[in-house]
Amino acid sequence: RDVERSRGLGDVYKRQDSHIHTMFSSDSEENPVNVVNNAISLGFKHICFTDHNDFDAPLEDGKVMFDLDFPEYIKYFQNLKESYKNKINIHIGVEQGLMRSVADRVNAYDSAKQLDFIIGSSHLVYGEDPYYPEFWEKRSAKDTVLTYYESILDNLGCCHNFDVYGHLDYIARYIPANSYTYNWHDFNDLICIILKTIIEQGKGIEVNTAGLKYGMPEPNPCLDIVKMYHDLGGEIITVGSDAHEVKFFAYRFDVVADMLKNAGFNYYTIFNERKPEFIRL
């Protein structure tokens, strides 16, 4: 693996946040300019915006959610990229919701190849949203988590137009209190198959630090899953805050370098024009 040499361990915090949301996402009001200026002030060299696009997301109060205005999005960020080209490298990405029912649209997305990066994520489980309490009422919490992981494997069989799978154990953020104490070992075999499939498809995973602000003890996915991914031969691994407000940009990136090293990595990944670049820790 060819790995770009950087100036030291601390540089991992100053390279790129690869998962950021702005006013182009239905659940954020953040102005991208605020994020860019903050990144520059912190010494970041790269930044990648990844606003939501979730086909067939459930309506909220009668409004369509997470339907990205792609032409306007590209136009805006291409202009922003040009404006800041001498200060920071702005990459344009999307966080794409994956489901079998929308696979054709996912696979045809960005046919003109204007994006640098696509995160594929499971926000919905066969069309249902684990964010809402009623999602958890149909079966036991443990069985619901199993269904979530089964849906990821199903998504991998039909959705191919993405670069890394986002926040792999995302479901753990929303398990109702006093229902089931999440333990990834309960799903070890299935997670192993998921990771092997991701690797076989030449894709990667992300370390998403947003879980820490939800009170979780580790980023998503946890260290053990990241280590399993490495031990199975996984190479592509990005780092993202999943920030929806500028104050969470690069949130808790201080824990990431040690986490990746403990998992066996000596680098992490950024994407440019859908191609991975490897940055030494």
Which stretches of residues belong to each language-model region?
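Single conserved hydrophobic/aromatic residue that forms the stacking wall/gate
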Residues: 1-13
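Conserved residues at the C-terminal ends of beta-strands
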Residues: 50, 121, 168, 208, ...
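Extended substrate/RNA-proximal surfaces in nucleic-acid metabolism proteins
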Residues: 60-63, 67-200
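Structural preference for beta-strand elements that scaffold enzyme active sites
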Residues: 15-17, 46-48, 89-93, 116-119, ...
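Short loop/turn motifs at secondary-structure junctions
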Residues: 8, 43, 114, 160-161, ...
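An N-terminally biased module of ancient metal coordination in phosphate/nucleic-acid-related enzymes
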Residues: 11-103, 109-112, 174-185, 209, ...
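Charged catalytic cores and adjacent phosphate/nucleic-acid-binding surfaces used
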Residues: 11-22, 32, 126, 178-281
